[in-house]
Amino acid sequence: MFRLLKRACSFLLLFVIYQSFVIHHNVQRVLAYKPMVEKTLAENDTKANVDLVLAMIYTETKGGEADVMQSSESSSGQKNSITDSQASIEHGVNLLSHNLALAEEAGVDSWTAVQAYNFGTAYIDYIAKHGGQNTVDLATTYSKTVVAPSLGNTSGQTYFYYHPLALISGGKLYKNGGNIYYSREVHFNLYLIELMSLF
């Protein structure tokens, strides 16, 4: 029994070390975009900041694709139509800045603006009419009743989403319903990047 426990602990330790290495590698890849993000923000009148944009890049692609902010769909309506990282960041920052301005105007929290990056700007009005604060419950309802049906999922079909923040809340997402945990993942990744930047 002790030998089995020892093996399990060794395996767990190796897994944690490996995951730490992967996360550190991904963070360094994202941080390589920092000068580009700083330049783009300096050229825009925006409430967005460097750390938030980098956390969104980490959440979207971990810096591993040309369209680092997954800006194509909001730009052209088609996936992967942006093939240049600078263009992706410029469009992503413009959209985020627009969302932050709308959120301030509507009197809702800034994390609603971040969630709207995933759900679309109409989410800001939805939150304004439902308490002014982005929550997982409101995001879930909006995903199920607005986003998913608009993209063809009228039956409420779900799938399992393997992310620690999702697992805490049951781990399901609605097919074609966006990511109800998006703003929380970005928030978590802010701290993750900050932590990994120390090493």
From Swiss-Prot:
Record Pfam families: Lysozyme_like
Q: Which organism is it from?
A: Streptococcus pyogenes serotype M18 (strain MGAS8232)
List all disulphide bridges recorded for this chain: none
The family database entries (SUPFAM superfamilies) matched by this protein are listed as: Lysozyme-like
Q: Where are the transmembrane segments?
A: none
Q: Where in the cell is it found?
A: Cell surface
Any single Gene Ontology cellular-component annotation: cell surface
Specify the protein name. Answer: Pneumococcal vaccine antigen A homolog
Q: Recall the taxonomic lineage recorded for the source organism.
A: Bacteria, Bacillati, Bacillota, Bacilli, Lactobacillales
